[in-house]
Amino acid sequence: MEEKVLDLLLTALKDRGLVKAGGRQRTDSTRVLAAVRDLNRLELAGETLRATLEALACAAPDWLAGAVSVREWADRYGPRTHSWHPPASTSKREEMALVYGRDGFALLEAVHAPDAPAWLRELPAVQVLRTMWVQNYHRTVTEAGAEVKRRESKDLPPGRLRLASPYDTDARYGLKQGSWWTGYKIHISGSCDDADGLDAATGQATPLGADGPPPRLITSIATTDATVTDAEMTEPVHHMLAARDLLPAEHFLDSGYASAELIVGMKKNFGVTLVTPVLMNSSPQARAGAGFDRTAFTIDWDKRQATCPRGDTSTWWSPATLRGTKAIVIKFDKETCRPCPVRDQCTRSKTGGRTLSLQPRELQEVLDHARLQQDDEQWRARYGTRAGIEGTIHQAVAVTGMRRARYLGLQKTHLEHVFSAVALNLIRLDAWWNGHPLDRTRVSHLARLDLSLAA
């Protein structure tokens, strides 16, 4: 249901020929900060335990009074962690972390004791405490007693599973372009057709009041936790567009959304051409811009053979799996490569022959074609269309405050994003109908919007 309001708007816009399938669209993502504080591991442990005690004090005050030393724990966990400064000494901070750990395990034991009300362990705050302690602490029980230790960084669970806040259990730590944050990511898709393309594809006249190119409207909004990569969302975004019958013929994306597999898969499964740069050849020769990289070799897929720049052929062709993906490994005989006068320009191996690693034929040919296109000035000018999505993201952040979540949890945050997308579409429609420049919209335009569209 959270998508309903955007679905209704886009259906009305499709009926008026303002959005359509088969045109051009562009997509990009940006970070969203959760409505919680950033906490280090010490603060996270203390605040999680404090939040659990607060929940138990409300749900079962009489039981809590008999289970823990209320006065001592109230002094320790009464204030929120951001209201005081932790010790400056590393040893004292480590000792405080162990105190938190021992207290947390003691509270969990009390909650799960046979004489404790069974429903206490079902409280969300208790569930969060249990998960947080499993992720951050070790406990070893011996005849001498229980020993509690904090997990080392290498022993922490992967970021996609690791809780970042006791209050928003969907928020995660994210990293993009060297920037860390706690929260989510949003993927925004929007139309970017020109006027001629729109009229030719829909067969409809330009709506009254329109002037210049058609409005750039948001067609899809996807919200994920901060650890989900752009490439993981390429297919889901196309499924969302297909469900609205708004799949483009060309989809402009940055390299984070693309791979040879995705370029081929989107064309086969959705009929969509991804217009996107791909990662360049990462071989030592290609990075140095000197010597013979893979493109200097001729590949005969039918004969399963490669020919080097000097005309020698490979002696080994074998399917393989490299870093979890299918590949083809090609090798040249070391006796052929060893006396070669240009050996230093071809391989860094001191004794062996040259080795090539290729993707399966269909993927490799798509990758080679995409890399060749990227060097063409005409393709670069065409790809410049993608840059407009940055303006959409800027408007979303400046006008609707999309950079910061207002609510806790992924579902409510996504609902907020859907309503923000609808608001931006209405603002852009009003600006377009009233003859304002496409990318210079103001919130005040919304007040003059003709509400016949919504009706």
Name these PLM-found stretches.
Residues M1-A455:
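Anion-binding and metal-coordination hotspots
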